[in-house]
Regions:
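Glycine- and aromatic-enriched low-complexity segments, predominantly in secreted/extracellular proteins
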Residues: 20-133
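Classical secretory targeting signals
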Residues: 1-22
Length: 133
């Protein structure tokens, strides 16, 4: 009886986590539906890094790189809000996200999210002078 209860509890928890993950991916799609995200592009990419569920499978070195990238995204968002552009730091972030999006230990869906984020940042790099703030 206890074993059945324990298994049932684990299954319910797993379904709950799966539903929450699905909601996050749906919410992410909604966030990027129109152009309002542009003023907060670095903040949104950082949120994506915070929610990547498969990062725990990555190597310590990869997790440290992702943490450093989160910090750089915060810096870039602050600079953007001040009207400043830092191409060097942006290139570092793009390189880091590119490496992460190619890491086989991350789930394919999480790699797709990182690849999409990389494309958004490359678009910003190319058009930052005309980017909506």
């Amino acid at each position: 009886m206890r074993w059945t209860f324990a298994v049932g509890t684990v299954l319910v928890a797993a379904l709950g986590f799966s539903a929450a993950a699905q909601d996050w991916y749906h919410d992410r799609d909604e966030r990027f539906r129109d152009e309002h995200w542009r003023a907060h592009v670095f903040e949104h990419v950082r949120t994506d890094l915070d929610h990547i569920g498969s990062a725990w499978r990555a190597a310590d070195r990869e997790r440290r790189r992702l943490e450093r990238t989160r910090e750089e995204l915060g810096d870039l968002q602050a600079k953007m809000e001040q009207g400043r552009y830092d191409g060097g730091e942006l290139n570092d972030v793009i390189d880091s996200l590119t490496k992460s999006s190619n890491d086989e230990r991350l789930s394919p869906r999480d790699r797709d999210v990182l690849h999409d984020d990389t494309n958004r940042l490359m678009d910003y790099r190319e058009h930052h002078d005309h980017w909506a703030r």
